[in-house]
Amino acid sequence: MAPMPPAANRPDDATGPAVAVAGTASGLGTRVLAALRADPDLGRVIDLDTVVDPVAARAGLGPDDTLIHLGDPGVELGPDGLPELDPSDLRKGLEASPSVGHLVVLSAAMAYGAWPTNPVPLTEETPLHPDPSFAYAARRAEVERLVGEWRLDRPDVGAAVLRPAVTVAAESVAWLALSPWSARALRASGADRPSQFLHLDDLAAAIDHARIHRLDGAYNVAPDSWLSRDALADLAGPVGRVHLPPSWVARVRDLRGRLGVPGGRAGEAYVEHAWVVANDRLRATGWEPRLRNEEVYVEADPGGPLADMSPRRRQEISLAVAGLGLVGLVVDAVALIRRRARG
């Protein structure tokens, strides 16, 4: 018997349910499509970002089919490494899919908010309470509200909402280095926020798992446990991490953001307060993370030029670099002000 062709190339009358995916341009989208195309039980895999008529494709989804909404078209990533997601685009997509039988939507652990009173870890029973001034987290909470609203008239439709932790992989090296989650990022003295790092492969597997088992409800997606500040510093290798007073850190991040430097602003509270999540509920359905926090971070942060230096020398260089960085930011700010004044 000839092997079954890839799902994306199977004819329209192929047997088995169809799966339509929105937001496939990112590394996550590539992984999800690969998993779907490897499933011989699927009839069709529809890439809504590239199909000629996505509205018609959505309208053709039936009770046995699944819609997976990963994010917006394009490769722009949010501050947690997930694809950006516009709630208005999701609303339009849901309205165009009136008969679909199952939905998988990507939210984020950031939707819980980062508060001094957060339990460690956060579970799905914790209400979503993002800081409304941090637009990214507020959008994720709005996404979940839209899914709940859409389901009111569809009690028989299952909807899995996944809330991943910070998500990275080997291709995330540059992104992580510029993010506030790197061990090399500025930290306020005394801050000891725990960290979680989920691998893109494990998130893609969780999405496919939710599709296969037609999960319903909210599920955190994260590795087992989390990393303390000291554990993260150890994993990053011999790096010189500078600790500054909280007011200095806030000013530097604010200035970086105003100058358009990546990673300048990621929601101040998320950098200072705990928002790690428990994965027990998803694990109970049969999903397991393949990689631990430690393995994920090391893959995405292979180390830098300080790796072979002594701790004392690393600290001396780090302090010097931090000072130069502050001076450089001030110089950039002055130059920016002068350019605007001349304009």
Q: How should these model regions be labeled?
A:
Residues 131-160:
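Active-site Tyr-X1-5-Lys
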Residues 150-196:
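NAD(P)-dependent short-chain dehydrogenase/reductase
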Residues 206-266, 301, 307-315, 337-342:
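Mid/C-terminal beta-alpha module of Rossmann-like enzyme folds, strongest
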Residues 3, 292-343:
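Amphipathic terminal alpha-helices
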Residues 259-289:
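Conserved C-terminal active-site "lid" loop/helix of NAD(P)H-dependent oxidoreductases
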Residues 91-135:
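Conserved Rossmann-fold NAD(P)-dependent oxidoreductase catalytic core, especially the SDR/UDP-sugar
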Residues 51-96, 114:
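NAD(P)H-binding glycine-rich loop region in Rossmannoid oxidoreductase-like domains
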